Regions:
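N-terminal glycine-rich phosphate/adenylate-binding segment common to multiple enzyme folds
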Residues: 1-49
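Short, active-site-adjacent cap segments at secondary-structure transitions
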Residues: 1-2, 51, 101, 167
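Feature captures the catalytic cores and cofactor-binding loops of soluble hydro-lyases/lyases
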Residues: 4-18, 31-32, 111-193
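Conserved mixed alpha/beta catalytic, RNA-binding, or beta-rich assembly cores of soluble enzyme
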Residues: 23-27, 40-149
Length: 193
């Protein structure tokens, strides 16, 4: 448990003990840390307060547009991503032909994309959404160059993010590379699928 003999201090042990009585889901751990910081008068702010310009509205960003079948996968993927988000599992799914190839869990977005893309054997759709009850102080969904590179490694063809609720970082570089690779990137609102 304590690799390299790094042992938590008494305060951290108390936090871990409280968590043991609850669960070790991402949101539970993070909320416990936010509450602990609050005891010292430290407020954790909404991450999006200063990052709204990085959270685009609905649009297609790339030269390549998703096909009709890929849009069916996007719609299916949104439902799946919201379902896993509601269980605090992750925020990303990889879909092909309306079948779930991978669901993000503790391994993170990029590992999920690589696993799902490999299982799909090319042509997969990646969908990233916010959790249904997303606490905007932490774990706001984000995509960037690493996301795109994971997709390119395994031949994924579409990245769909939730409009207004996903951070799109390194956008200029991402779009340039996506256009060269023939990958479609779009942001959508679930109610418009």
């Amino acid at each position: 448990l304590y690799k390299d003999h790094v042992i938590p201090d008494l305060r951290a042990l108390k936090v871990l003990n409280r968590l043991r009585k609850k669960n070790f889901k991402d949101d539970t751990i993070t909320l416990e840390l936010v509450e602990e910081l609050g005891k010292d008068g430290i407020s954790v702010l909404d991450q999006t307060k200063y990052l709204k310009p990085l959270m685009p509205g609905p649009q297609i960003f790339t030269k390549r547009r998703p096909t009709e079948n890929e849009m069916l996968d996007v719609a299916f993927g949104f439902k799946a991503a919201k379902a896993i988000g509601g269980m605090d599992l992750g925020q990303t799914v990889v879909i092909k032909d309306q079948a779930v190839m991978a669901v993000e869990a503790i391994e993170g977005t990029d590992a999920c994309i690589r696993r799902g893309g490999m299982l799909a054997r090319g042509g997969a759709v990646v969908v990233k959404t916010a959790k249904p009850d997303q606490d905007l102080r932490f774990d706001v969904p984000a995509v960037g160059l690493e996301t795109l590179h994971s997709m390119m490694e395994t031949g994924c063809k579409v990245l769909a993010i939730e409009a207004y609720r996903t951070l799109f970082v390194e956008k200029t570089s991402v779009l340039k590379e996506a256009d060269c690779a023939g990958i479609a990137i779009l942001s959508v609102e679930q109610e418009h699928l």
